[in-house]
From Swiss-Prot:
Location of region: I-domain: 122-253
Region: N-domain, residue numbers: 1-104
Extent of Basic and acidic residues compositional bias: 96-113
Disulphide-bonded residues: none
Predominant subcellular localization, coarse grouping: nucleus
Sequence segments annotated as region (Interaction with PCNA): 336-344
Class in the EC hierarchy, top level: hydrolase
Record EC number: 3.1.-.-
GO cellular component: chromosome, telomeric region; mitochondrion; nucleolus; nucleoplasm; nucleus; protein-containing complex
PROSITE patterns according to UniProt: XPG_1, XPG_2
Binding, Mg(2+) 1: 34, 86, 158, 160
Name of the molecule in the record: Flap endonuclease 1
Family the UniProt entry places it in: Belongs to the XPG/RAD2 endonuclease family. FEN1 subfamily.
């Protein structure tokens, strides 16, 4: 879910924080991409009618086609993508995950009814609501990225939080995800619609946290409290308090704790066992990768192993895959003359750490610690 209604609220009260750009304007930029969100989008969008793409064995392949071609499109436009995969979800998210399971169960019932009635539109709608990213989808996308020469990292917790950390440390220009809580985790720049279908013709939206805070007149900590009031994945919100009222209350009382002391709790009853303090801590001090240990490398695609995996195992058309590899190699050669501040260094390993501010610009350039083993990006053989 992310943060309920945050994008609209920013558009209404802090419109100067949003910029719209064409994908070509990001030539030479490194971008950290929320991998799970991208895979979810591919499973929904890359379809034949209501059905996901499958090979002859009945294995889903929509995620691989989406990841392959959308990544090539980014590279052709000079973007250097870095995919960030989710780790273990925080305990606070268990309630939200349970709700999602319940919604999928409800969608399954509606799908069965639609199939019995032959309602094609509803069949497609409810089929998409059943989509869930599995470990197999994730593992296959990691293998694909490795063979394409595209770096990825594995976050210890929420991918959005580690994406935000990479932006704050200067490792990448922006975090790309549809989840607005990446701003709540402190990402200076958030990009939406980067991995959207080209056919949708959606401009890429940039949200700039410093302008959001400036226009709202809030500190980051107050912004976190505002996001909790709007509704997040980690705790309930106060029923009856909408976005504009939430902004007014934060501006007037500064903290959720003070708001609780002053609002009429009969009119605005607090959630039972409200875990707002735990949610605050999770946003302000999430479990993230240590940016000092992150070194990224963009390498040549391994054409033969890509063909073996995508065509031999997953039964994609060999000519199309080879053409895709040629496009990728050609684009990589053309993008070496990018922005001066944007070049991938040697590969390294990633360690889990609580988020911390980089002490100096130089600290983000330290060599990767080879004894860290949480996650690694490896070059294809």
């Amino acid at each position: 879910m992310g943060i309920h209604g945050l994008a609209k609220l920013i558009a209404d009260v802090a419109p100067s924080a949003i910029r719209e750009n064409d994908i070509k304007s990001y030539f030479g930029r490194k971008v950290a991409i929320d991998a799970s969100m991208s895979i979810y989008q591919f499973l929904i969008a890359v379809r034949q009618g209501a059905e996901v793409l499958q090979n002859e064995e009945g294995e889903t392949t929509s995620h691989l086609m989406g990841m392959f071609y959308r990544t090539i499109r980014m590279v052709e436009n000079g973007i250097k993508p870095v995919y960030v995969f989710d780790g273990k979800p925080p305990q606070l998210k268990s309630g939200e995950l349970a709700k999602r399971t319940e919604r999928r169960s409800e969608a399954e019932k509606h799908l069965q009814e639609a199939q019995e009635a032959g309602e094609e539109a509803n069949i497609e709608k409810f089929s998409k609501r059943l989509v869930k990213v599995t470990q197999q989808h994730t593992d296959e996308c990691k293998k694909l990225l490795m063979l394409m020469g595209i770096p990825y990292v594995e976050a210890p917790g929420e991918a959005e939080a580690s994406c935000a950390t990479l932006v704050k440390a200067g490792k990448v220009y922006a975090a790309a995800t549809e989840d607005m809580d990446c701003l709540t985790f402190g990402s200076p720049v958030l990009m939406r619609h980067l991995t959207a279908s080209e056919a949708k013709k959606l401009p890429i939206q940039e949200f700039h946290l410093n302008r959001v805070l400036q226009d709202l007149g809030l500190t980051w900590e107050q912004f976190v409290d505002l996001c909790i009031l709007l509704g997040c994945d980690y705790c309930e919100s106060i029923r009856g308090i909408g976005p504009k009222r939430a902004v007014e209350l934060i501006k007037q009382h500064k903290t959720i704790e003070e708001i609780i002391q002053h609002i009429d709790t009969k009119k605005y009853p607090l959630p039972e066992n409200w875990l707002h303090k735990e949610a605050q801590k999770l946003f302000l001090e999430p479990d993230v990768i240590n940016p000092d240990d992150v070194e990224l490398k963009w390498t040549e695609p391994n054409e033969e192993e890509l063909v073996q995996f995508m065509c031999g195992e997953k039964q994609f058309n060999e000519e199309r895959i080879r053409n895709g590899v040629k496009r990728l190699s050609k684009s990589r050669q053309g993008s070496t003359q990018g922005r001066l501040d944007d070049f991938f260094k040697v590969t390294g390993s990633i360690t889990s750490a609580k988020r911390k501010e980089p002490e100096t610009k130089g600290s983000a350039k330290k060599k990767a610690k080879t004894n860290s083993a949480t996650a690694k990006f490896k070059k294809g053989k």
